[in-house]
């Protein structure tokens, strides 16, 4: 559309190679943000009107692996990106944003893989079979049938979404697997339930709607843009998600 989105959220890792003194130096890391600034400089309406949020990933530089993780320090951002963008935030991970009366949570972690390793029992699909749906088709809209079919095909992500929302916390794992700063534990809370949770996970792009205590929370995995060009667009007014992809030819 002619009007650009109001908010862009970038979740790390911001380099293909994990940051480290022997793999990726400070100068190369800063240069990547300078290159992004040069690209955005060609689109005045975007850099002047839109808000940008950068959330570090597990492979980005930081002083700890415990959550919540602080935002990228100024020394690693360079000066060009902050000079180019009028509205830019280098936020913590996770990050909570209040946007047009909606509560949005962004969390970058390969949580689905972690949960799979710690899963004692596999997710149980209690939705029945498609034959059961056929017997109930008079009481079920086509949209509801499609939703149940999608849930049946991908129960693991739904299982993770329900776990996070029901426990009202972003970590379903013991501290030995996912350490947390107790003094900052409130940053991991999901109470009251947010309108949407964006989980930056390297698994496939997915979107699920959970309904806990009659509070609908949309959980989205936008995918990994660096791997296959996938990303997600969220429309707050309709509470709809558009899972998109940029082809290799376009990139």
Regions found by a protein language model. Give the residues of each.
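Extended recognition/assembly regions associated with phosphoester-bond processing machinery
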Residues: 1-251
């Amino acid at each position: 559309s002619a009007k650009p989105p109001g908010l862009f959220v970038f979740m790390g890792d911001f380099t293909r190679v994990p940051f480290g003194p022997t793999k990726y130096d400070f100068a190369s890391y800063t240069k990547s943000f300078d290159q992004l600034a040069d690209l955005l400089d060609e689109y005045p309406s975007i850099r002047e009107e839109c808000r940008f949020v950068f959330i570090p990933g597990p492979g980005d530089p930081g002083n700890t692996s415990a959550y919540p993780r602080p935002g990228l320090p100024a020394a690693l951002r360079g000066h060009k990106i902050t000079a180019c963008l009028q509205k830019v935030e280098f936020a913590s991970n996770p990050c909570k944003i209040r946007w047009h009366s909606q509560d949005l949570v962004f969390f970058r972690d390969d949580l689905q893989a972690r949960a799979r390793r710690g899963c004692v029992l596999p997710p149980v699909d209690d939705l029945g079979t498609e034959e059961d749906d056929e017997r109930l088709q008079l009481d079920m809209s086509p949209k509801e049938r499609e939703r149940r079919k999608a849930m049946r095909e991908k129960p693991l992500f739904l299982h993770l979404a329900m776990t996070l929302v029901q426990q009202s916390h972003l970590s379903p794992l013991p501290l030995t697997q996912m350490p947390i700063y107790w003094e900052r534990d409130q940053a991991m809370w999901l109470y009251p339930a947010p309108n949407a949770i964006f989980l930056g996970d390297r698994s496939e792009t997915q979107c699920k709607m959970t309904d806990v205590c009659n509070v609908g929370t949309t959980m989205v995995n936008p995918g990994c843009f660096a791997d296959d060009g996938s990303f997600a667009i969220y429309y707050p007014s309709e509470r709809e998600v558009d899972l998109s992809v940029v082809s290799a030819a376009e990139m």
